[in-house]
Amino acid sequence: MAVYAIGDLHLSFQTDKPMDIFGPGWIGYEETLYENWQNTVKPQDSVIIPGDFSWAMYLDEAVEDFRYLNGLNGRKILLKGNHDYWWETKTKMNRFLKENGFNNIDFLHNNSFEIEGVNFCGTKGYDSKEADEKIINREITRFSISYESIRNKSARTIAVFHYPPEKELLYMMAEYNIESCVFGHLHGLEKS
């Protein structure tokens, strides 16, 4: 079994927000993603999705995005991103999954997951240029709650964020002996 991570899918099967307005690299990306995913990810694998999964504004507008995701191989674990406006309480989201028969999707929110002896904990994080103290403290608290939910703290732990981790979260990772993390938000890197 393998664990993969990919963020910022920005699916919009029910909303009129095509990604190709951001450049030709996005044209037909859903088909390319599907083909590459199915050729790489096996049914027994897991995929961490650190945010920005869907452009939907409300959960009921994300049904087709979830249907697409559910049809992909592997177990998917979603973390909230800055554009996941559809995100509700975990109870409502789990009910939504059950009502729609989406049986291979979970949410990383104030909890953690153990996959093949490796722990995954995390939170959305924040952009230090935009976040105020309240948001920073909220994300620190959520990361702490997520980490504290881990049963076997002696096992390897990987942190999951949407935003690249800022100094407070990096300090916490060091305190918790977390040596690696995955994150989304950055769609590409350009050399300056």
Annotated model-derived regions:
Residues I115, T123-I140:
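Histidine/lysine/aspartate-rich catalytic loop segments that bind and position anionic ligands
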Residues L9-H10, N82-D84, N110-S112, G125, ...:
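Active-site beta-loop-alpha junctions enriched in small/polar residues
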Residues D8, G51-D52, G81-N82, H162, ...:
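Active-site glycine-centered loops adjacent to acidic/histidine catalytic or metal-binding residues
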Residues A2, T15-I115, Y171-Y176:
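Core catalytic region of metal-dependent phosphoesterases/phosphodiesterases
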Residues A2-H10, G117-Y126, I158-F161:
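Active-site-proximal beta-strand elements of phosphoester/diester hydrolases
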Residues L11, S54-W55, P165, G188:
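Short active-site segment of divalent metal-dependent hydrolases/proteases
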Residues T32-S46, D132-S192:
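His/acidic metal-ligating clusters that form di-metal
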